[in-house]
Amino acid sequence: MKGTPSFGKMNKTPTHVRCRRCGRNSFNARKGYCAACGFGRSKKIRRYSWQNKKVNGVRLV
């Protein structure tokens, strides 16, 4: 079977499970990498300058 009935089976298992490196629930079990820290994709921690922002709008380091 393909198409619309098959898409109903996609919500049985969780897409993201807890990451071993960052501890967040962002590790894609099927693809094998973390969306938050990049574990499984690279040795370096995934980090961007636009990630953190203070309440007054000033960006943190």
UniProtKB/Swiss-Prot annotation:
InterPro entries: Ribosomal_eL37 (IPR001569), Ribosomal_eL37/eL43 (IPR011331), Ribosomal_eL37_CS (IPR018267), Ribosomal_zn-bd (IPR011332). This is Large ribosomal subunit protein eL37. Belongs to the eukaryotic ribosomal protein eL37 family. A zinc finger (C4-type) spans 19-37. Zn(2+) binds at residues 19, 22, 34, 37. Binds 1 zinc ion per subunit. Binds to the 23S rRNA. GO terms for molecular function: rRNA binding; structural constituent of ribosome; zinc ion binding. GO terms for cellular component: cytosolic large ribosomal subunit. It comes from Sulfolobus acidocaldarius (strain ATCC 33909 / DSM 639 / JCM 8929 / NBRC 15157 / NCIMB 11770).
